[in-house]
Amino acid sequence: MTRNAPPGQESTDLAWLVTPAKDLVENFSIDVLKALAGYLEVIRQESEDTDNQVDAATTYRLFDFQRACRIIQGSCAVYGRKVDHVYELTISVVDLVENKGQDDGNTGSRRGAGRRKNFNLGSTNYDLADIDSLKQEALANFEKTVKEEKKSIDAVRMVENAEVIESQYERKSCLVAKPTQFMFKLNYGQLNRTDEQILNAKSRPDVIGKVKDFEIKKSKVKHDQQILYSHDCYRGNLDQFTLPGARWMPDNKELAANFGVADLEVELDLEQEHEKISAYGPFKDPLSGREVVPPPRWFIEQEAVRQNQEIQSRATSRAITIAAKTLRDSQGFGSQPTRLSQPFVERHRQSNHLNDFLSFVEGRVNKNRPSTHLTTGLVDMFVDNFGSVMQNDEPNTSRRPDENYAPMDFDDDFGGGGDDDDDDYIRNLSRRDEKRAPAPWDELDKNHIIWYTGDENLPVVSKPVKKITKFQPKPAEMLARKQRREEKINKSRRDEFMETHDYLQDYYYWRSAARINPIKDWKIESLRTAILAEKKRRIKEKTAKIREARIQNMQRKRTARVIPVEQFEPVTEDIPTSNRRTLGAEYDDVVDEDLAAEVELSMFGGGFDDDEEDVRPRGERPPMAPNNLEFDALQTDFDIPPAEYVPLRFEDIDDAELNSVINLPGNLLIDKALPLLKKFAENRTDREQMAYEMAKAYEDVDVAVSTLQEHVDKWHSRMEPILEEGETRKEYDVHAVGRAVIGQYDIEGGTKRLLDLVMDRPWYEISRYFLSCLFMCNVGNVMVSEDMELPLEERINSMKITLLKRDMHCEMFKEAGALDA
């Protein structure tokens, strides 16, 4: 600011210069850069014209627009902040230039459209704010703010969790209103329609229970409304399980009582065992005898919270005032389309009125099920008692509403909402599928991204990264670890043999199918053909018995002319009667479908014993005399003795059949198995022989252990000392062995035989010395020579090593630090 106020002419000139800036008050959408560029050009031009005329002491410096324009053009990130600051400073300058000295009272008298707007900009300090200091202060308080936010979030969560837990563990007592037509008739005390099914509201309805699933406890019947009020929890009203739609929040006592454990039994168990019985089961249902496992606690809590939210959503979406609806009676008469009411209604009791209704069976009820509809009573009661009051708010009614009556909210699901397709109920339920908005405390947990302009001087801390290197263990150590793990496992001799046997079958003989399909076992395959042959023989024998019995019991039409049995039987055998149920499909051994079912059942051993006769023929009825035309009494049946049953013996099986079915992995087991089968098959049946062979194969160690096990044991005894001795050897270092070889020479240029160098050395170090000599020969430390005239097998004995120099390359590299780099 200047020391003296400018004169009037100069004030007018300055006001003309800042006219575009004054327009920012009315229209901020102008091009600020273009306007500031115009300011800069005008100031430059006037400064050049008046530079030599105006004294420096009388120069009025209001604002450096050139500096402001450069700041805006140089920093695009802070463009908006700078423009706002320039705008505020410009407006304050205009107010000071035009309004200064007019505070003598004349300003207050100027009213109307010509009055200038006053801007309260606060302080007239035009110094730019120190952004760096503000940022440093904000960064210093950032951690403190974050901690306070976390504490507040934790406090909110604790309060909410406490409220949720308190609501969960609160003993809920719900009032259920049930139509009396499902319970008791008024004229006689007998259950009515107890087997009617209750369906849910899916597109394909599922049965969720029957009427008889409900028990009435602590109930009161109101005959005028035909509704039964039950002041009890849902679990007391349900017989065994909670049906879908019921809102039940159990505690430990209810869990123990509702899943088959009575309170008396709990007390007796507590007195005897002095321990608390878990309320989460499993328990045994005393009615059905089956084991009932209740859901886990976390599932019960989750379902309780979800059901509570669902109740609120349903109550909000379905609470529609009656002003826009028309209630119809229970018989379906009225202007609205036909809409049947729902079978069950649950409600909360407030004062003595039915204020709201929630459907017990969730979803829309199928209207084609008249067995579960309220035919009389409930809706008529609503129309008679509340219909006229609820219609007071309609615009066309002249009756004044009751002042002492509050309009109620209820489920207007009876009229259908005026839609022809009657889908208003489903449309209102669509709100349950909407996604809930996230809670405010969930948003606070997210890490918000802080935007920086690039001008901040943020402290940067760099920490060294710890490099973790994991080396591969040595082969000897890996082998030792494996042996230590295997030593801890206690295995029997048979398990070790089977592991070796499976390994050879999979990797040596390529017989992995034996492990994939355990059914293909030699113990079963060896008896498969014999078992099938015996089954076929029994089927044929039983089929013959059944046919014989049916022929004997065949009822013949008694006429004046009776055909003798000797003439009738050959005809029936040549032309069998086809079965109408098989539609012409004949069986090989069986003619009738019932006979085929019996034979098939006998093949699987279903309900038939070997030593029991399945069919006992009643005997043949001889024909009556030709001269007797009347029906006489039936003659006494006579029994035919059953045929003797001969069980299958393995001695009947020939050697060729046994050799064709037995497939064993070795000749030794075949040689042992065949005599064994013949030896014990003389006095045993097929089942006894199968049981003996199965037990023998698993229990007799002498049969299971073969020459393969002996070879494996010998191989183990020979290889284990070698492997153990190999683990005790030192690691091979080519440079260390090379130094030992050079150390045996006294002077450079000396020559020694390889046999002299390895004298008194272990046998495994001979190859190490030889490889070290070859390595030093490549780097120029020694020279290897041999007698070329000798044969190839004897040249190794004549090999000579000559020392050329003692300095090794590895030591030179180590001194220079090349190996470490």
UniProtKB/Swiss-Prot annotation:
MF terms in GO: chromatin binding
Disulfide bonds: none
Region named Disordered: 389-426
Keyword Transmembrane helix attributed: no
Keywords: Cell cycle, Cell division, Centromere, Chromosome, Coiled coil, Meiosis, Mitosis, Nucleus
Protein name: Condensin-2 complex subunit kle-2
Lineage, uppermost ranks: Eukaryota, Metazoa, Ecdysozoa, Nematoda, Chromadorea
GO BP field: cell division; meiotic chromosome condensation; meiotic chromosome segregation; mitotic sister chromatid segregation; mitotic sister chromatid separation
Gene name of the record: kle-2
Top-level taxon of the source organism: Eukaryota
Homology family: Belongs to the CND2 H2 (condensin-2 subunit 2) family.
